[in-house]
A protein has these predicted regions:
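Conserved catalytic-loop position in the HRD/HxD motif
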Residues: 29, 34, 39, 51
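Activation segment
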Residues: 47, 55-57
Length: 156
């Protein structure tokens, strides 16, 4: 409960940022929905994406944000790596300022904290598992780095 207020404030800032954004047809397309390292495989013909069960018509940066979030969690929110990921994406697709604002709003949301606490609330258990407690402690410990990453990546 000690961290709830700050996480809620961050979530509200994220939502406020995203609510300002329109679903501009120029920036939408088919998104994988769960684009991460587990859904990219190497074949004899090159790299391929698999598992499109969660695909959707949405902002293109949603897949980039999901991929970045997974990578950054595993690399302690390294700003240099985040910059490299955005630049690699930019080599393939132009990122307009409006899309960068969407990316900022998505990455600002404390998704992992929400995911863990939501899992607990919906499990209908009277106790939280030791595994979930450890996950929650890790997320809370990384929160300062995560927020610094978002601020530095977008020069805020």
């Amino acid at each position: 409960m000690r961290h709830y207020a700050s996480m809620l404030e961050t979530a509200e800032a994220s939502i406020a940022c995203l609510e300002k954004q329109e679903l501009n047809a120029l920036y939408v397309g088919i998104c994988h929905g769960e684009y991460n390292q587990h859904n990219v495989v190497r074949t004899d013909d090159g790299w391929r994406m698999v598992h499109f069960e969660n695909y959707a018509y949405s902002w293109r940066v949603v897949d980039l944000a999901n991929f970045m979030r997974k990578m950054m969690e595993k690399h302690n929110w390294d700003v240099a790596l985040g910059d490299a990921l955005v630049e690699a994406y930019r080599k393939e697709y132009e990122l307009k300022q409006e899309e960068l604002q969407k990316l900022y709003g998505i990455l600002l949301f404390p998704e992992k904290f929400w995911k863990i606490t939501n899992h607990y609330m919906n499990s209908r258990k009277t106790w939280i598992s030791e595994r979930d407690i450890e996950k929650l402690k890790k997320v809370i410990a990384q929160e300062t780095e995560r927020l610094n990453f978002v601020e530095n990546l977008f020069h805020i």
